[in-house]
């Protein structure tokens, strides 16, 4: 098994319910703040130029719904399926409206699904929900002006973990007659890719036997056959520490895969989403980096230009490695 010394500051809680409540509150506050910032400093007419459909049922059995954000009159647009974080325990799709609006205002079709969470379900049940939402997206992307040949899975924190497993572990999409290579790419924002040993509830969420520990780690399934990966990570993140993204990129290089690693100085766990919402000077160029990747995902094993410095970030670019 591939192991890295993990991250997780605030994921550690003494009591399950206190931890879940704190996670939910933190997720809600982050989402609320970013939404206010986006509404204040974002494009004044961005939301008015969007076609938004909320509450679409994609899994009637489990009452799961998703929201779609698309530019008006979109045609052949790239599609991003975004999975929000919350320690696999908290979060709601409506809290991340600002993510949908921000990305859609840049020409992308965005799908934000809900998924079941602990303690209602344990791993891998929420992975089945994520794969099901992805299958729905393939079937319906064209209805919203999206291109089913250019569907990316993305996520922040625990959502980045979910997106990475969809892209790397073939079993989840296979249940819905898809493969990871049907995806155009994976975009992880401070994703948890290599987080053993577990802390607190993680053993209950994923299972503390050998199979559960192995299957929970996206890094174990990087074999060079996954789609290109964009790994965005703040160097000041003490919840999901940078060695998650660094180890994932190094593993991709070792397996002759493609991972573009972007490391941002003075950026913590929530700053990536705030930067995505605000996009102001002096913040890490999260939106620009996502748009560049979506516009032209790097070919497998192709050498990318070395990273450039920015006031808030230093970026190391090379498929699956550091420079």
Model-derived features: positions:
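Alpha/beta-hydrolase active-site loop
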Residues: 122-141
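Mobile cap/lid helix-loop segments that gate and shape the active-site cleft of serine hydrolases
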Residues: 45, 61, 191-221, 227
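N-terminal cap/lid segment of alpha/beta-hydrolase-fold proteins
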Residues: 36-73
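Short beta-strand element of the alpha/beta-hydrolase
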Residues: 76-85
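Short beta-strand/loop motif that positions the catalytic acidic residue
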Residues: 231-233, 237
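C-terminal catalytic histidine-bearing segment of alpha/beta-hydrolase fold enzymes
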Residues: 255-301
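Short amphipathic alpha-helix adjacent to the substrate-entry channel of hydrolases
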Residues: 94-111
């Amino acid at each position: 098994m591939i192991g890295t010394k993990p991250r997780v500051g605030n994921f550690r809680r003494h009591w399950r319910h206190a931890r879940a409540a704190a996670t939910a509150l933190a997720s809600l506050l982050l989402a609320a703040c970013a939404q206010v910032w986006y509404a204040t400093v974002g494009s004044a007419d961005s939301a008015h130029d969007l076609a938004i459909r909320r509450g679409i049922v994609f899994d009637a059995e489990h009452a799961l719904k998703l929201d779609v954000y698309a530019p008006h009159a979109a045609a052949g647009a790239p599609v991003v399926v975004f999975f929000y974080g919350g320690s696999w325990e908290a979060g709601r799709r409506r809290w991340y409206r600002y993510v949908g609006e921000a990305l859609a205002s840049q020409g992308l079709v965005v799908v934000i699904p809900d998924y079941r969470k602990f303690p209602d379900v344990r791993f891998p049940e929420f992975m089945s929900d994520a794969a099901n939402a992805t299958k729905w997206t393939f079937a319906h992307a064209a209805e919203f002006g999206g291109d089913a040949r250019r569907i990316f899975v993305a996520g922040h924190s625990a959502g980045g973990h979910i997106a990475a497993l969809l892209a790397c572990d073939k079993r989840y999409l296979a249940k819905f007659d898809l493969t990871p290579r049907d995806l155009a790419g994976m975009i992880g924002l401070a994703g948890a890719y290599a987080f053993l040993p577990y802390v607190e509830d993680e053993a209950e969420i994923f299972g503390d036997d050998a199979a559960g520990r192995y299957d929970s780690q996206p890094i174990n399934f990087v074999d060079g056959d996954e789609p290109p990966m964009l790994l965005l990570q703040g160097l000041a993140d003490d919840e999901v520490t940078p060695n998650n993204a660094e180890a994932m990129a190094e593993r991709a290089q070792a397996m002759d895969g493609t991972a573009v690693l972007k490391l941002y100085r003075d950026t913590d766990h929530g700053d990536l989403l705030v930067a995505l919402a605000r996009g102001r000077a002096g913040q890490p160029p999260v939106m620009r980096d996502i748009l560049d990747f979506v516009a032209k995902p790097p070919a497998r094993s192709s050498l990318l230009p070395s990273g450039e410095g920015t006031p808030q970030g230093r970026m190391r670019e090379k498929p699956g490695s550091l420079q």
